[in-house]
Amino acid sequence: MATANLLDLNGRREMDKAKALESALAQIERQFGKGSIMKLGANSPVMEIEATSTGSLGLDIALGIGGLPKGRIIEIYGPESSGKTTLTLHVVAEEQKKGGVCAFVDAEHALDPAYAKKLGVNLDELLISQPDTGEQALEIVDTLVRSGAVSLIVVDSVAALTPKSEIEGDMGDMQMGSQARLMSQAMRKLTASIGRSNCMVIFINQIRMKIGVMFGSPETTTGGNALKFYASVRLDIRRTGGIKDRDNVIGNTTKVKVVKNKVAPPFREVEFDIMYGEGISKTGELVDLGVKAGVVEKSGSWYSYGDERIGQGRENAKAFLRANPSVAGDIEDKIRASHGLDFSTGEIGKDDDLVDM
């Protein structure tokens, strides 16, 4: 009898809790609007993370979701001439292919339109701003994000976002922490509207050295710690070597490490070629990733796909794939399938491949 009464009492308590929860949810929705709170179930749009390709198949795989996540803050940093802007322009080109509107906030005043066009960027549809101060740049970003019409914004770079107080002051004036305070305020203001508008904001950043570091890496990024916390993905990009054609250096081998990733496992690394004036080598990645995935066979110096030999040596194999876009498309689809990614939307044509040896 006592057990039955206890169960009945517990049942009433659970019913009271459920009613109290329903009442609280209804009050929140009345006060803040429908959708301000919801259950994170399978039907929730929050569960589906849309991604934009980086232009590098290997990096798309390393990121775990097939590219960089929409509606998030991204940081790409590295030493000078490591490929930061090149990688970002590839992302812009890929987003434009999907019909998205892209904006480039050129705080460094260093964007090369001819180079951007070579990477596949549609200059006629690209919005560009060259602000005078850091406050002006971030206010422009905030306005574009709140419009809901822009799907990708690039800020190049955080180091060039100079606070107004520093510009108006004398050359020798000390402005301690002014840029960090500016970035911290911008992150607090931007983060909610970025999520609502599903707009991706990429911040390109530079590296500085901390003084007096005895243990660990002395490297740090500019603009304080706020960006590190608010960024969903942080990419560390480095140049690891040169690519030569006889005596001429025609490109770089580049390594990218996923330092932070809130949407997939982090700390993955990928290497690819960046050719001078042309961008990321897609056929080079297909050869390397195809061998790793078992799609392309390598025997000695020969590369084979199925029963067909596609070239002796890596450069000859790349040349074969450039000349045979249907084979390149098949290899890419199989590589994507082996990593659980969506198939490519089309074949790699000669115009899409950015390597011309």
UniProtKB/Swiss-Prot annotation:
BP GO annotations: DNA recombination; DNA repair; SOS response
Upper lineage: Bacteria, Pseudomonadati, Pseudomonadota, Alphaproteobacteria, Rhodobacterales
Cellular component annotations (GO), alphabetically ordered: cytosol
Subcellular location: Cytoplasm
NCBIfam families in UniProt: tigrfam_recA (TIGR02012)
CDD domains hit by this protein: RecA (cd00983)
Any GO MF annotation of the entry: damaged DNA binding
Residue numbers binding ATP: 78-85
Role, per record: Can catalyze the hydrolysis of ATP in the presence of single-stranded DNA, the ATP-dependent uptake of single-stranded DNA by duplex DNA, and the ATP-dependent hybridization of homologous single-stranded DNAs. It interacts with LexA causing its activation and leading to its autocatalytic cleavage.
Family under the similarity heading: Belongs to the RecA family.
Pfam families assigned: RecA, RecA_C
InterPro entries, A to Z: AAA+_ATPase, DNA_recomb/repair_RecA, DNA_recomb/repair_RecA_CS, P-loop_NTPase, RecA-like_C, RecA-like_N, RecA_ATP-bd, RecA_C_sf
SUPFAM superfamilies documented for this protein: P-loop containing nucleoside triphosphate hydrolases, RecA protein, C-terminal domain
Record key words, sorted: ATP-binding, Cytoplasm, DNA damage, DNA recombination, DNA repair, DNA-binding, Nucleotide-binding, SOS response
Protein name: Protein RecA
Matches recorded under SMART domains: AAA
UniProt main location, coarse: cytoplasm
